[in-house]
Amino acid sequence: MRYSIIIPAHNEEIHLKDALSSVHRQTLKPTSVIVVNDNSDDATESIIDEFSVINPIIQKLTIISSHLHMPGSKVVSAFQNGLQQLQDDYDFIVKMDADVILPDHYFEKIAVIFNNYPKVGIAGGFAYEQDETGEYKRNHPMDNDHVRGAFKSYRKDCFLAMGGLRNAMGWDTVDELLAKFHGFDIHTDESLKVKHLRPIGKAYNKRAKLLQGKAMYTMRYGFLITLIASAKMAWKQGKFNSLLDNLQGYFSAKNAKIPFLVTVQEGSFIRALRWEKIKGKLLR
């Protein structure tokens, strides 16, 4: 299968070499790799140039944006800029972060998944992060049928059906919900162990939690599902304040009448899907 990779990169000189090296070693080679140099002021650009010489399918796109960390919107905006440079001749498209190391056979196995399971729209492995001893251990705070936003592969038909990625926090949740809305499945493979070099949530703060609550509003979760989802995250993180911050973000978005990310019909489907999952867990 033919596939293309888009890698948003903002000041990634520490990790980018490892990420691009893992792409270069893939047993199934991509047809193109676009690294979006998003307003970097470190050695990110020179690293991309170095790899472009080694492997001509690796291309650089430089854009100018804010230096602020904007969870969700900044990375998706960079991805969308890269998407504009792509040819249309791919079977699946990959959104990859600049701080992950993929196993050499990663995309060979992703291609097998898409070939063998025509209904699969999104596929990926699991993230492993270093603990205090330096050992890589699985860190997957979401459900096992969720693919982390750092290494997502989308079947072309699914990507087009859901209208690409939403430029907002929560994009890597709404994409899977919309994929299911359009009749596609999510597939995770436990054998695909991805090394994530930057611990999850390291750059997140109170502002990010407010945006998370806003995302739940814009996905049309409704208050009760937002409350349950926020409480679950707060419990897993051991941070009660994150529950309050999420709810504050939700009601701020509601009072400001922020535009929704999904249609009324999509929202109805999403709520039904969420309630089904919640009830399923309660009955276990």
Regions found by a protein language model. Give the residues of each.
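Conserved nucleotide-sugar donor-binding
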Residues: 148-163
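Short beta-strand/loop segment that forms part of the nucleotide-sugar
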Residues: 30-39, 62-63
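Non-catalytic, C-terminal membrane-associated alpha-helical segments of glycosyltransferases
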Residues: 208-284
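A conserved acidic beta->alpha catalytic loop
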Residues: 37-46, 100
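Conserved donor NDP-sugar-binding/catalytic core segment of glycosyltransferases
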Residues: 101-137
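Active-site nucleotide-sugar/metal-binding loop of Leloir-type enzymes
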Residues: 76-92
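Short beta-strand-to-loop acidic/aromatic patch adjacent to the donor-nucleotide binding site
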Residues: 89-101
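Short, acidic, metal-binding catalytic loop of nucleotide-sugar glycosyltransferases
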Residues: 21-30
